Amino acid sequence: MTRLPILLLLISLVYATPFPQTSKKIGDDATLSCNRNNTNDYVVMSAWYKEPNSIILLAAKSDVLYFDNYTKDKISYDSPYDDLVTTITIKSLTARDAGTYVCAFFMTSTTNDTDKVDYEEYSTELIVNTDSESTIDIILSGSTHSPETSSEKPEDIDNFNCSSVFEIATPEPITDNVEDHTDTVTYTSDSINTVSASSGESTTDETPEPITDKEEDHTVTDTVSYTTVSTSSGIVTTKSTTDDADLYDTYNDNDTVPPTTVGGSTTSISNYKTKDFVEIFGITALIILSAVAIFCITYYIYNKRSRKYKTENKV
């Protein structure tokens, strides 16, 4: 009576043993293999199928026969000449490839001339993970992820004011002390002088006096004058810029000639110089010489052909 409980315990341990598991990620390749225990008998055929009722392949040496829409492009048989191991590789894993795969060996005895066939099968569970890291990689690396813990009580967290963490600092207004320093620059408006050559009238637009701001006992003055002369050939505008240094030198120079006023005079400006006329004459002469050369060459060719034609007619 004591043997029965022990036998039941052994049977329960055998059937309670989990299958070997292989965990892979989607898109990877999974290699499954089985080793047979009976190494004395002769292997007639090996087979692979997927539970519950899906036959994958039957293999006898290098001859492989696929079933249930499986192909060698999806599942390859990798041990055609090995009698001890049968191996397959499932390529480009998808979620549908997960499940329990069973390998089977069909063997006959090499010593007896009987037709008895022995049978061995082994199961392997394939897990296809959708995460970026597979379970087997986590186990092999030995890394564990523990959740973060907090020593604060829930009521402390509820009463905690989040606004105390993020304080918005209001910047102080930026004031500029006007009394301490003042940066100013004095500008003098342009003085535009327009002289009409045809009518002989001269008009001058004068601007208000410059505004001077004292800071370091110096004044920066830039004077820009424009003079527009209207002539029969067009309008000529000249620009002259005078700074403080030039004014100072002009004031101290005894040889400075005061400006003169133009009135009632007609100004004629020539845009062409002697050099320009020489270039135009040279280009014209070159064109004429080229035309004469072309004419001479044409006349010579025509005259030569005419003589040749006359000679042929005489003959």
UniProtKB/Swiss-Prot annotation:
The record's account of how the chain is modified after translation: Glycosylated; contains phosphate and sulfate-substituted glycans. O-glycosylation is required for hemagglutination and hemadsorption activities of infected cell membranes.
GO cellular component, one term: viral envelope
Entry keyword set: Disulfide bond, Early protein, Glycoprotein, Hemagglutinin, Host membrane, Immunoglobulin domain, Late protein, Membrane, Signal, Transmembrane, Transmembrane helix, Viral envelope protein, Virion
Ranges facing Virion surface side: 17-279
Biased composition (Polar residues): 193-202
Glycan-linked positions: N37, N69, N112, N161, N254
Origin: domain of life: Viruses
Localization, UniProt: Virion membrane; Host membrane
Annotated protein name in UniProt: Protein OPG185
Species whose genome carries this gene: Vaccinia virus (strain IHD-J) (VACV)
Taxonomic lineage: Viruses, Varidnaviria, Bamfordvirae, Nucleocytoviricota, Pokkesviricetes
